[in-house]
From Swiss-Prot:
Gene: pepA
Catalytic activity of the protein: Release of an N-terminal amino acid, Xaa-|-Yaa-, in which Xaa is preferably Leu, but may be other amino acids including Pro although not Arg or Lys, and Yaa may be Pro. Amino acid amides and methyl esters are also readily hydrolyzed, but rates on arylamides are exceedingly low; Release of an N-terminal amino acid, preferentially leucine, but not glutamic or aspartic acids
Gene Ontology MF terms: manganese ion binding; metalloaminopeptidase activity
InterPro entries from the UniProt entry: Leucine_aapep/pepB, Macro_dom-like, Peptidase_M17_C, Peptidase_M17_leu_NH2_pept, Peptidase_M17_N
Keywords: Aminopeptidase, Cytoplasm, Hydrolase, Manganese, Metal-binding, Protease
Protein name, entry field: Probable cytosol aminopeptidase
The protein's role, per its UniProt record: Presumably involved in the processing and regular turnover of intracellular proteins. Catalyzes the removal of unsubstituted N-terminal amino acids from various peptides.
A Pfam family recorded for this sequence: Peptidase_M17_N
EC number: 3.4.11.1, 3.4.11.10
Active-site residues, record numbering mapped to chain: K281, R355
Length: 502
């Protein structure tokens, strides 16, 4: 699909469709007013008859509007003008795109990017429109024997900006939005893949393919034999019950002018299926445990977006691939594991396995002498209880890094919120037999999980993103969300000095 920006009057647009907004109650947006004037009040007369109230997401497709060069005009309900916020704006864009796609408008000029969204500029509106468009048109149907086809799908979308001086900003927003959308799609595709296909070896194959596609990327795969030599006993223990070999994929992107500049390291939990192991999960909903690798999928998607943007920064992405299954060789509650760092862990629950994989991955990345490390993981159900399905949890040992990530989440509208990590929570991890236990009980489960990880991240600035509530959706809209790719790319845009705000 082709995107572009322009600055022009609606009456001069010769397109299959023009998209303009209508506010409640039946009040035309400034652009719609221009079309109404040209058409001698044709549009306002329809509104007076009650054809469109202007409620959020309402659509009215008009044909052959008098005086308008475009074949069609799509009126889009935008709700009350003063209440138009970020979420509503993105939902309106998605509904608009779906309507255009379903009604055979193969190209359109969209004036919704001229609407006033509280606290947001043209760059944000255009970029979010691109991301929302791609998100709304996303499908995962490769395993369906009969694939649905759109007869005349939307192929070209032009976003109008208020002034010509904003054209460069709009073009930058499209470039960024397309790269991020590409990363989000890659993340979704990996997450939605069935676990009989998307095992650790599949993750590794995708990492290799990324290196084949981009000159700035190199990939290294670490299998169980090398992990054994490295002393990654905790990581290896989790995968012992599965016939699928554990594999850690190291994706290195070098874009900084100084190739020796310290890298930012992203570590993704890649449990391609988590049965819970010996501490078996309930059967209901267990199919969704294929999404336990969404941390790794989001790191993969971020690396892809990064390569597309060719940002001047060095980044290393780690996909910690593993499968947690019960079996005669599976690790057990009561086992004591010696981690790569030399610290010992008493296993009280084999379903708290993500931290046992991540702790060795966090120790491994010390060798890169990182500028900072951010791990991403569907780690705790407690985070879903604390923050629901809308906001990602952030925990960190470094205040400036935590602030950077939360700020990036605000800029990208991929929301995150910082949770505390006080010393008192470490008390819950004490073990009478080892240096620590792998769980700390029900109270503050997200925090104690982060406290566990922090014991392996003392040699660098570190942050942990718990995406257990935000990585996928259940129910009718079941599927990977592609989060937090947008937030991570924004973080890297900021780190590389890219200006994304007016």
């Amino acid at each position: 699909m082709e995107f572009s920006v322009k600055s022009g009057s609606p009456e001069k647009q010769r397109s299959a469709c023009i998209v303009v907004g209508v506010f409640e109650p039946r009040r035309l947006s400034p652009v719609a007013e221009q079309l109404d004037k040209i058409s001698d009040g044709y549009i306002s007369s329809l509104l007076r008859r009650g054809d469109l109230e202007g409620k959020p997401g309402q659509m009215l497709l008009l044909h052959q509007v008098p005086g308008v060069l475009s074949e069609r005009v799509l009126l889009v309900g935008c709700g009350k003008e003063r209440e138009l916020g970020e979420r509503q704006y993105k939902e309106i864009i998605q509904k608009t795109i779906n309507t255009l796609n379903e009604t055979g408008s193969m190209e359109a000029v969209c004036f919704l990017t001229e609407l006033h969204v509280k606290g947001r500029d043209t760059y944000w509106k255009v970029r979010q429109a691109v991301e929302a468009t791609k998100d709304g048109l996303y499908t995962f149907d490769q395993f369906k024997s009969v694939k649905p086809e759109t007869r005349r799908p939307l192929r070209k979308l032009v976003f109008n900006v208020p002034t010509r001086r904003e054209l460069n900003l709009g073009e930058k927003a499209i470039t960024h939005g397309l790269a991020i959308a590409s990363g989000v799609k890659a993340c979704k595709d990996l997450g939605n893949m069935p676990p009989n296909i998307a095992n650790p070896a599949y993750l590794a194959s995708q990492a290799r393919r990324l290196a084949d596609d981009y000159e700035t990327i190199t990939t290294k795969i670490i299998g169980e034999q090398e992990m054994e030599k490295l002393g990654m006993s905790s990581y290896l223990a989790v995968g012992r019950g599965s016939k699928n070999e554990s594999m850690m994929s190291i994706i290195e992107y070098k874009g900084h002018p100084d190739s020796e500049a310290k890298p930012i390291v992203l570590v993704g939990k890649g449990l391609t299926f988590d049965s819970g192991g010996i501490s078996l999960k309930p059967g209901e909903g267990m199919d969704e445990m294929k999404y336990d690798m969404c941390g790794a999928a989001s790191v993969f998607g971020t690396m892809k977006a990064l390569a597309k943007l060719n940002l001047p920064v060095n980044v290393i992405g780690v996909l910690a691939g593993c499968e947690n299954m019960p079996g005669s060789n599976a690790y057990r509650p009561g086992d004591i594991l010696t981690t790569m760092s030399g610290q010992t862990v008493e296993v009280l629950n084999t379903d708290a396995e993500g931290r046992l994989v991540l702790c060795d991955a966090l120790t491994y990345v010390e060798r890169f002498e990182p500028d900072c490390v951010v791990d991403v993981a569907t780690l705790t159900g407690a985070c879903v209880i604390a923050l629901g399905h809308h906001i990602t949890g952030v925990l960190s040992n470094h205040n400036p890094l935590a602030h950077e990530l939360v700020n990036a989440s605000e800029q990208s509208s991929d929301r995150a919120w910082r949770l505390p990590m006080a010393d008192e929570y470490h008390e819950q991890l004490k073990s009478p037999f080892a240096d620590m236990a792998n769980i700390g009980g029900r109270p503050g489960g997200t925090i104690t999980a982060a406290c566990f990880l922090s014991k392996f991240a003392k040699k660098y600035n570190w942050a942990h993103l718990d995406i257990a509530g935000t990585a996928w959706k259940s129910g009718a809209a079941k599927g990977s969300t592609g989060r937090p790719v947008s937030m991570l790319v924004q973080f890297l845009l900021n780190r590389s000095g890219q200006e994304t705000e007016e």
